[in-house]
């Protein structure tokens, strides 16, 4: 008798995706982050749903409702901090996932990669909207500064800002619509994840060597299910350690003060996971130029397949490209550090230098390294 998982219409889909899926035998731990991101999304949707039951999207009561969740709701503090720190874990896994794709040439799966970039934009938008909801000082001023960037768009900019705000300033209408979008976007992200999976399963996974692995495939279960469970344990341990021992480590103290339009914080900054892009934005004195650089700092990922010049897919056997890759990682960490510093000397100069290096590495040095390595290999 044939196993039910291979004949049942629904179980058959699960079986071909997670049980009998042929996977390369050489996948390292860097391939764990896709499954970790799925867990992160599930945690965020679950905690967010329960938080939404107690939160009120009104400027008069939003701050108080978050306080009420932490003080009066059973395990409300746990829900709130799981959600807030879960977002940080989400971005850690997301950036490592993208970095893995860059290092091992996974961007050569065009459809999967482009859907992934769309997912990155959607997750960043969701996180920004969520940061506004507690209606603290940094929520209010972050929303004001970031949405105001739309005014840099020629001709229609000012109208777009007022359209997003729902008035002439960040106010009640802004908070209401931000909550509505923050609620619906994770479900759109979940749908995009399905499309991401669909395209990935059309081609099969890449592997650390970058060489087609059709001759050496193993079933996903039990090998990679066990491996993924180990990843879940490590990630959830890190998340729970953060939540129970230092829940405010990655937050901003200013957000514990209710929003006050008459008092500007000394240093307006987004959450840590946006600081690298924020530095690039600040590095250009021109407003429109800064906004374009901000968007291009993420959109540049779409261009990676076109910038691939090496005859090898992965960087595993390409030492020059490896050096440039780790230089890019160091540059991104520098950008993140500078984003948290005030706009003054020497931070501005370091930020501008790091921003130029970021684009130069991706657009100029990495493609040149690929060509050089081809010549060195006499290809």
Curated annotation (Swiss-Prot):
GO biological process, one term: mitochondrial electron transport, ubiquinol to cytochrome c
Bound cofactor: record note: Binds 2 heme b groups non-covalently.
Cellular compartments per GO CC: mitochondrial inner membrane; respiratory chain complex III
Topological relation to the membrane, as annotated: Multi-pass membrane protein
Subcellular location, record wording: Mitochondrion inner membrane
Residue intervals passing through the bilayer: 33-53, 77-98, 113-133, 178-198, 226-246, 288-308, 320-340, 347-367
Cystines in this chain: none
GO molecular function: metal ion binding; ubiquinol-cytochrome-c reductase activity
Cofactor(s) this protein requires: heme b
Residues at which a ubiquinone binds: 201
Keywords in alphabetical order: Electron transport, Heme, Iron, Membrane, Metal-binding, Mitochondrion, Mitochondrion inner membrane, Respiratory chain, Transmembrane, Transmembrane helix, Transport, Ubiquinone
Residue numbers binding heme b b566: 97, 196
Binding residue positions for heme b b562: 83, 182
InterPro entries associated with the record: Cyt_b/b6_C, Cyt_b/b6_C_sf, Cyt_b/b6_N, Cytb/b6-like_sf, Cytochrome_b, Cytochrome_b_C_euk/bac, Cytochrome_b_N_euk/bac, Di-haem_cyt_TM
Other comments on record: Heme 1 (or BL or b562) is low-potential and absorbs at about 562 nm, and heme 2 (or BH or b566) is high-potential and absorbs at about 566 nm.
Subunit structure: The cytochrome bc1 complex contains 11 subunits: 3 respiratory subunits (MT-CYB, CYC1 and UQCRFS1), 2 core proteins (UQCRC1 and UQCRC2) and 6 low-molecular weight proteins (UQCRH/QCR6, UQCRB/QCR7, UQCRQ/QCR8, UQCR10/QCR9, UQCR11/QCR10 and a cleavage product of UQCRFS1). This cytochrome bc1 complex then forms a dimer.
Function: Component of the ubiquinol-cytochrome c reductase complex (complex III or cytochrome b-c1 complex) that is part of the mitochondrial respiratory chain. The b-c1 complex mediates electron transfer from ubiquinol to cytochrome c. Contributes to the generation of a proton gradient across the mitochondrial membrane that is then used for ATP synthesis.
Official protein name in the record: Cytochrome b
Protein species of origin: Mystacina tuberculata
Lineage: Eukaryota, Metazoa, Chordata, Craniata, Vertebrata
